[in-house]
Structure formats: C-alpha cells, structure tokens
C-alpha cells in the first residue's frame, strides 16, 4: 500500500475551479499530454446537490502491440468513479484500470478550499494505491521490487497529471450558453 498527496494552489476562484473540474473535464484534454480522451459514461445529479460521475480515461501510449496483446487490451486507461459533495467541496473517487483490475486498487479524495484571499483555490489531492500482483505469477523475489516500482510510478504520474489537469482548468474559458 502506498499513500500519495499533492497540493496545488491556483489563481482562480473556488466556485469556478469546482465547476470546471466537475463539468468540463473532457474539454481539458488538449492540455494533457498523457491523456488521449475522457468520456463521460454516467452523470447523476442528486436532490442533495451531490453529483455522481463515471468517466473513462484513455491514455496516449507508446506501447508495443505485443505487450497490449499480453495485457489483453487494445487501449490503456481507467474508469474513474467520483462523488462530488458541494457542502464540503470534496470529490471522493475510485480508479479502476482497464487491465489488472483484480491487482490494483486506487481510491482517494480531492478537496477544494478557498485561497489567496478568495481569489484562488487550494486543491488537495490524496489517496492510496494497493497492488496485489499475485495474479501475475511473479516469483516471490520479484514481487516486492516490482510492486514498489509500480507504486512509485503511479504515485508520481497520478499527481503530475492532476497538476496538469488543474492548471488546464485554471486557464479554461467557459463558453457562454
């Protein structure tokens, strides 16, 4: 199990950051070098103000076709299930990868708080990732090092991509309807 945490402060008011991150995620991909597309699969708005979202994230990849065949997929990415709670400006989420679903568990929360005297937003992104690589039939000698290596990559890449998404959201211009 590996915990991760990232804090980003942006020069955009909290109400705007909250709405853009919840409602326009798919429009931010032009500024995300690792993400090919984000598809909203489900959106449910509850009477208490909560919004439940299910998004599919597809990554840009330079992975040999033989490796994709070995993984049993044509595309890499994950399903993001989130609950946006407006009362405390928190988004609780889980991530389910397209491959090795039984081996990877990732969950956490993103908290939005006022910053810069109300002119900005502090975003705290924290979670935990657990890898159980027994299904890969690695030798006991390799399982620990491989697990630590993958955890290290995931706990570095995920926060880096979050920073990119947040910076894209801070620069995003919402079109008048």
Please place each PLM-identified region on the residue numbering.
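Hydrophobic ligand-binding cavity/cleft-lining segments
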Residues: 1-66
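Residue-level preference for beta-strand/loop junctions
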Residues: 2, 74-76, 104
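Well-ordered beta-strand positions
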Residues: 9, 45, 83-85, 113
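Hydrophobic pocket/interface hotspot
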Residues: 17-21, 125, 165
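Short strand-connecting beta-turns/loops that link adjacent beta-strands
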Residues: 48, 87, 117-118
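Beta-strand/loop substructures that line and gate deep hydrophobic ligand-binding cavities in soluble
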Residues: 53-54, 78, 83, 92-151
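Helix-adjacent hinge/juxtasegments
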Residues: 62-86
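A conserved amphipathic terminal alpha-helix motif
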Residues: 86, 139-177
């Amino acid at each position: 199990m590996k915990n991760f945490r990232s804090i980003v402060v942006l020069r955009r008011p909290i109400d705007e950051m909250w709405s853009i991150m919840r409602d326009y995620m798919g429009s931010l991909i032009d500024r995300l070098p690792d993400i090919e597309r984000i598809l909203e699969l489900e959106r449910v708005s509850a009477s208490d103000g909560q919004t439940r979202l299910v998004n599919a994230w597809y990554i840009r990849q330079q992975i040999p076709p033989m490796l994709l065949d070995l993984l049993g997929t044509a595309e890499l990415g994950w399903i993001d299930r989130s609950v946006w709670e407006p009362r405390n400006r928190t988004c609780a989420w889980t991530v389910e990868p397209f491959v090795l679903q039984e081996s990877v568990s990732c969950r956490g929360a993103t908290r939005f708080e006022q910053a810069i005297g109300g002119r900005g937003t502090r975003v705290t992104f924290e979670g935990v990732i657990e890898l159980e690589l027994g299904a890969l039939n690695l030798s006991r000698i390799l399982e620990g090092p491989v697990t630590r290596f993958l955890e290290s990559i995931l706990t570095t890449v995920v926060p880096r991509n979050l920073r990119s998404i947040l910076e894209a959201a801070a620069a995003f211009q919402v079109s008048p309807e």
